[in-house]
């Protein structure tokens, strides 16, 4: 009997209903007139407490609650791979087709497509005895993964009917099984399974096979086992954000600091606060500018964000740009190839002097701005800021002053003063007279109302050089109006230098010139800022790479070159709007500060002290791409929308290195953003792990990545608070530890159900995002009690450009002894001994560095200095790995062991040489050291192995030289 009740209380995502007699714990119910999806999480008599997976705004007491008789379950069958779901397995692409970009409340859609036909290949025949877990058929779901159709757990008997090879939908019966009781069970290609119940298996195996990732610091020093659990701290601070003083050009507020923009918009929409982060989903999106389809155009910003970062990167360019962003904020580099303009994102912490970043040259758009003509007295005022008014303002801002009721414009060219006077008469109905002053001729106009109008437009009344500002109306005007102002201001010169004491005014000028596609340079001289407008020159250059020959061409030369190779579109469209500015200085500022961001449709916006392209969004892509797991489940749990967008855009672009096919063909994405109801965030973890267990049961090795479990725990905290439960540490529920353990314990390497012997695994890698990088907070501490591997990301290593930035002193793996037999049997019997010896060297280096800080390196004995030399080689030549190099991005196990053997052989020979009296300076000069430094970029393992003989030969020569 289906339970039916009525709502008596609504508190955020929690709803209390009475009249629910007969309902069960964890039963799915439909809530309210809209039929919102909810789950019963507490029963008290006939009252049910329900967590609702959709927004409950507008739901009122008295509305119905109807039970479904089923628990929260997922559909498991062909169609899972390549799909993108929300936290309760609703297919987001299907829902988008139904309701648009936002999920309408109460909308449902089947998780697996019902009309698509799959090619079924039977693997069993009539008369076969089967049990739960047996494979009765296969479906080639993607070009990488074959989907095994299994008998659901709990069903056994004899096959009395099975479909022939052919194409079927998942709703068609493909087999019938007669149970021992005589009941006929119909089997389809999909099954349902409750997410909070782990799928059964025969036996749990010890985690003794490593999950090879190709990352040396992980595989060699802190290995993850198949079926194991690991935690990795997410990005410290607030991700890809900018400094609060960063200027943003908006249609509504003109050029404004992003901090002030946030303060103006804070709370004007749905606001979310989590720890030291807060953001608002705007009711009315604002208009900013961004790069789209080769042009800088108007775009909508839908969210504003504020957080805290533990440090910032400040980048200065040749034209005077100053960009202050978080280390993982992305900027754009680019070059022209035979295929056109290729823009590439690069993290700020990877930018170095000499790099060229894409910056804004020309901003399109603009409209005539209406002027306020109220309270202007006897004069007339134009309705809009037109070309003639812009020209008048240009002359005034360049050579004029406002005094009490008087405007004076100075110039020795009387014809120019007459032009200004005629403009004043035409625009305002007020004229003046030309007089001879001590230092030259001047046009004097006496009109207090006109002074008031001009002051309202932003013309400073006194100390103009300090208070000079570009009128907001002018920044938003079309290019013809801006051109009229600029021509008047610089009086037709091709080169001009404008000196201002106002830093803000100088930067506003750079935006104004960008409306015309004119780039400027800004430099500081004493207390003044010099804005220089020049002809095209060495600054307007294009990085070109055609026929494998990188070049840097001046823009005009590139235009001619472009015609010869068919790239006119690049020259005339894209490169009219952006230029490549050379980086001259990069420095890290290790001070915590507030940071800000806006979310836009193009994932970039124009901002900075001078117009610059800024990205608005740590990934586990490297692990997903290179680990030898066959299926990847990625759960974006409570991530901000722009970060989840990054994942949804980047994953489809990744190629599976083993097959060359898209990585999505072996991936399931679960996208549950922070602005979705917290209850769905809580469910997303269970949805993901259940799908992972299903592929495990087929015999696959599955890697599940949960990003981030900290935000999942925050969802538990909010729900617990609304349930009025006794809070534990920092407000988290007392059962936080058991919930985390329950999730991680579903990982494992197992013998699956079924008549045959089949082994599969689920390896869980959970990202934790401790506020401010505080590893002592409850989520991290409770996670560390459960997981066996901890990869500690180190911000200091990242600042020093050491990647992967995993700290070898604070990370650990409890699987080292478990996987050593696999390494010894399959790769090298001395793997564990070499690994321990290398770790001891790195730990000894850390101890010695403490002494060096006090007394300096020269005070150390030769032997200790030799340890520092070899440990540095270990760090730079082994632990450091280049994810952007096609060879070094993935290091096979055999190569890892060979590289380690080369380095430890060098260490042994170094110690022998020191004992035999060879000076360390001579050892440091050995040519083989340079070859060892390059071995990571060598594919041929035999060539790397040959370095051992070279090392021995060169040391033998040293021994002979010193008679040792």
Curated annotation (Swiss-Prot):
Biological processes, Gene Ontology terms: intein-mediated protein splicing; intron homing; proton motive force-driven plasma membrane ATP synthesis
Pfam family, one: ATP-synt_ab_N
Domain of life of the native organism: Archaea
Domain DOD-type homing endonuclease: 392-518
GO molecular function: ATP binding; endonuclease activity; proton-transporting ATP synthase activity, rotational mechanism; proton-transporting ATPase activity, rotational mechanism
EC number: 7.1.2.2, 3.1.-.-
Catalytic activity from the UniProt record: ATP + H2O + 4 H(+)(in) = ADP + phosphate + 5 H(+)(out)
Location of the protein in the cell: Cell membrane
InterPro entries, alphabetized: ATP-synt_VA_C, ATP-synth_a_Xtn, ATP_synth_asu-like_sf, ATPase_a/bsu_AS, ATPase_F1/V1/A1_a/bsu_N, ATPase_F1/V1/A1_a/bsu_N_sf, ATPase_F1/V1/A1_a/bsu_nucl-bd, ATPase_F1/V1_b/a_C
Record's GO cellular component terms: plasma membrane
Membrane topology field: Peripheral membrane protein
Keyword Transcription regulation part of the UniProt annotation: no
Post-translational modification summary for this protein: This protein undergoes a protein self splicing that involves a post-translational excision of the VDE intervening region (intein) followed by peptide ligation.
CDD domains, sorted: ATP-synt_V_A-type_alpha_C, ATP-synt_V_A-type_alpha_N, Hint, V_A-ATPase_A
Predominant subcellular localization, coarse grouping: membrane
Complex formation: Has multiple subunits with at least A(3), B(3), C, D, E, F, H, I and proteolipid K(x).
PANTHER family in alphabetical order: H(+)-TRANSPORTING TWO-SECTOR ATPASE, V-TYPE PROTON ATPASE CATALYTIC SUBUNIT A
Entry's family note: Belongs to the ATPase alpha/beta chains family.
Function: Component of the A-type ATP synthase that produces ATP from ADP in the presence of a proton gradient across the membrane. The A chain is the catalytic subunit.
Something else known: The intein interrupts the ATP-binding site.
Protein name: A-type ATP synthase subunit A
Organism: Pyrococcus horikoshii (strain ATCC 700860 / DSM 12428 / JCM 9974 / NBRC 100139 / OT-3)
Gene designation: atpA
